[in-house]
């Protein structure tokens, strides 16, 4: 970060602290993800408030904006004027230091994610940074706090205002990059394995896309339970890393039928199938289950076959979508579950309880987010390509500046 921007940020924090909660505007949930326009209004504007003078010389704030559905070029780097933070009641404003890239962001770019607000919109479901201002009624956060954020969208920008209830204090030893890699992947993996899967000693688990963000989180969480057998699918070049991280039986899905391979090793199947793929793979996972086993589907990665929406892939995935009757479940003693973190944004206590457990596991040294790569906003297309082409091992991150901030 340049000395000029550091000075500007310090001035912004000072101005926000003096202004306090009285500067709130009461923006709604979707407001943080909609970057303000930079055009000058035709009507005369009132003179700036005294507190605005501290940031009058601040450089514009940069944000990534999804301008249309399609390929990598649809996410553009734009800027907006730097104005004094004005969080509304129950909100806070933070300077973003790192943000996570998830499959939902890739699907959103192609128009396949229904939780994305209308375009143009700043994507990004998670991030981490420093609080610069708090709104009325926020008593458990203050300027200077380091927080990680889980939000519907809007995190891919230098400064963002979010509901305080969707922020979590970072452990002292955690870096901003680790914090930006924790929430989506580890909440998903934890709830799939423990809340739905009821993972216990002696169980066996199939982890698809085991080298991805959720996959690596799941491997670490499986190691917190004794004697868990893990089958992990990934390309052959990633198998050594998978073995080092607890995969008992890595499977190259490019060259091997994972169903046949698992049946050879474990004829009765597995106890838990983590399914981020959808389509025909959900059915395969169901038929791999032991009695009392569970398949938990939490994604539709099979929809993504390239940088742009593929109608044939969509038709194939939906045509092969798995269905089962209650009678069939009863007779097989199996369960099919669905998980979508985006639809738990109203379940504050539930999510908080999971984050509390994850932070405890981090502090105890049991989990630690694996970072694949860190990309500046200018290279967002390269970051998305890295993930879309499944070249990553662990989490892909974005940072506002050209240098990594910790």
Swiss-Prot record:
Subcellular location: Cytoplasm; Mitochondrion outer membrane
GO cellular component, one term: mitochondrial outer membrane
InterPro entries, alphabetized: ADH-like_N, GroES-like_sf, NAD(P)-bd_dom_sf, PKS_ER, Quin_OxRdtase/zeta-crystal_CS, SV-ATPase_mito-regulator
GO molecular function: oxidoreductase activity; zinc ion binding
CDD domains: MDR3
The protein's name: Synaptic vesicle membrane protein VAT-1 homolog
Annotated stretches, region: Disordered: 1-57
One record GO biological process: negative regulation of mitochondrial fusion
Function, as annotated: Plays a part in calcium-regulated keratinocyte activation in epidermal repair mechanisms. Has no effect on cell proliferation. Possesses ATPase activity. Negatively regulates mitochondrial fusion in cooperation with mitofusin proteins (MFN1-2).
Biased composition (Low complexity): 9-22
Enzyme Commission number(s): 1.-.-.-
Family: Belongs to the zinc-containing alcohol dehydrogenase family. Quinone oxidoreductase subfamily.
Class of this enzyme: oxidoreductase
Keywords on record: Acetylation, Cytoplasm, Membrane, Mitochondrion, Mitochondrion outer membrane, Oxidoreductase, Phosphoprotein
Topology with respect to the bilayer: Peripheral membrane protein
Modified residues (N-acetylserine): 2
Gene behind this protein: Vat1
Domain of life: Eukaryota
Phosphoserine: residues bearing it: 2, 33, 42
């Amino acid at each position: 970060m340049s000395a000029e921007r550091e000075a500007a940020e310090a001035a912004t924090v000072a101005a926000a602290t003096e202004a306090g909660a009285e500067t709130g505007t009461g923006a709604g949930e979707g407001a943080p993800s909609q970057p303000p326009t930079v055009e000058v209004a035709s009507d005369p504007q009132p003179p700036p408030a005294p507190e605005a003078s501290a940031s009058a010389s601040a450089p514009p704030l940069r944000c990534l904006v999804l301008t249309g559905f399609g390929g990598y070029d649809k996410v553009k780097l734009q800027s907006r004027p730097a104005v004094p933070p004005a969080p509304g009641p129950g909100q806070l404003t933070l300077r973003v230091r790192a943000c996570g890239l998830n499959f939902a962001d890739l699907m959103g770019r192609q128009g396949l994610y229904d939780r994305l607000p209308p375009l143009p919109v700043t994507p990004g479901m998670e991030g981490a940074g420093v609080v610069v201002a708090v709104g009325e009624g926020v008593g458990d956060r203050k300027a200077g706090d380091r927080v990680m954020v889980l939000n519907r969208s809007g995190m891919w920008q230098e400064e963002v205002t979010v509901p305080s209830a969707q922020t979590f204090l970072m452990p002292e030893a955690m870096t901003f990059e680790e914090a930006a890699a924790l929430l989506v992947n580890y909440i998903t993996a934890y709830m799939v394995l423990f809340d739905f899967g009821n993972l216990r000693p002696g169980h066996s688990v199939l982890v698809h896309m085991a080298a991805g963000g959720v996959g690596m989180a799941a491997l670490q969480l499986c190691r917190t339970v004794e004697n868990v057998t893990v089958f992990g699918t990934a390309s052959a070049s990633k198998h050594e890393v998978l073995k080092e991280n607890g995969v008992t039986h890595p499977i190259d899905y490019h060259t091997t039928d994972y169903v046949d391979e698992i049946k050879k090793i474990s004829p009765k199947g597995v106890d838990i199938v983590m399914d981020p793929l959808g389509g025909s793979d959900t059915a395969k996972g169901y038929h791999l289950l032991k009695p009392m086993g569970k398949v938990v589907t939490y994604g539709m990665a099979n929809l993504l076959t390239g940088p742009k929406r593929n109608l044939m892939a969509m038709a194939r995935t939906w045509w092969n979508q798995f269905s089962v009757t209650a009678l069939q479940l009863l007779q097989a003693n199996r369960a099919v579950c669905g998980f979508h973190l985006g639809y738990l944004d109203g379940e504050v206590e539930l999510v908080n309880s999971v984050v509390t457990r994850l932070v405890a596991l981090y502090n105890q040294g049991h989990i630690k987010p694996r970072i694949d790569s860190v990309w500046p906003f200018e290279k967002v297309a390269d970051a998305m390509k890295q993930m879309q082409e499944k070249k990553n091992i662990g989490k892909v991150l974005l940072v506002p500046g050209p240098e990594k901030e910790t």
